[in-house]
């Protein structure tokens, strides 16, 4: 069994490198970075509650995971999830391949369309 953690990295959260080093020291296997490039207004999709501030402020997952790759040796890096329908296909493929290369093959590419109908 492997253990990982997912976080919305923001300018007010722990830094990606700090968290990743602490996770690696404690035996975690992976860190997952969320993605929300924007939150549409108005939102037609109902949520159980108001979205937290982190949804609006989350950093780019490829940037944060590159910081993680540079600070760690074995921790797997994952997008959880990359909203591929909101991204340019060629640029996203290049980002994913670059991160995998920089990390020494530790990148896990989690993809999806998201849950918020207005983002799709």
Descriptions of predicted regions:
Residues 1-71:
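N-terminal beta1-alpha1-beta2 module of alpha/beta enzyme domains
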Residues 2-13, 84-120:
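Flexible, glycine-rich active-site loops centered on histidine and acidic residues
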Residues 42, 69-77, 114-120:
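Hydrophobic transmembrane alpha-helix bundles
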Residues 79-82:
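Loop-to-helix entry region of an early transmembrane alpha helix in multi-pass inner-membrane enzymes
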